[in-house]
C-alpha cells in the first residue's frame, strides 16, 4: 500500500457525518419497495442485454473460453432472477398473512 492511497482522517469523518444525516430521513415502505424494484429491473435488463449481445456475436460464440464465460453469465442471471422471484413470493405471502390477522 502506498502512502498516496491512504485517506486523511477528516475526509472519512466527513463522509460518516453525511451518512448519518441521510439515515434520519423518513422513507416510506412503498418508496423503498419502488426504489428496490426499479434498481433490480434496470440491473436485470442490462444483464439480459449483455448476455443477448454476447450470444449474437459470432466471434464470441465460436471461442470456447468466451462461450464458457457466456454460460456462466447466463447461470448467474438465472440464479438472480430465481432468487428475486422467490423473495418476492415470500414477501407477498408475509404481507398477506399480516393483512389477514
From Swiss-Prot:
GO biological process: protein transport
InterPro entries associated with the record: T3SS_SctI-like
Keywords tagged on the record: Protein transport, Transport, Virulence
Tagged with keyword Transport: yes
Stated role: Required for invasion of epithelial cells.
Family (UniProt): To S.flexneri MxiI.
Protein name according to UniProt: Protein PrgJ
Species this chain originates from: Salmonella typhimurium (strain LT2 / SGSC1412 / ATCC 700720)
Amino acid at each position: 500500500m502506498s502512502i498516496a492511497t491512504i485517506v486523511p482522517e477528516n475526509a472519512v469523518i466527513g463522509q460518516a457525518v453525511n451518512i448519518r444525516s441521510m439515515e434520519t430521513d423518513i422513507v416510506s415502505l412503498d418508496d423503498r419497495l419502488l426504489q428496490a424494484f426499479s434498481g433490480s429491473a434496470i440491473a436485470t435488463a442490462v444483464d439480459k442485454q449483455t448476455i443477448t449481445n454476447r450470444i449474437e456475436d459470432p466471434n464470441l460464440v465460436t471461442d470456447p473460453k468466451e462461450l464458457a464465460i457466456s454460460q456462466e453469465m447466463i447461470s448467474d442471471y438465472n440464479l438472480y432472477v430465481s432468487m428475486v422471484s422467490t423473495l418476492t413470493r415470500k414477501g407477498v405471502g408475509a404481507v398477506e398473512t399480516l393483512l389477514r390477522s
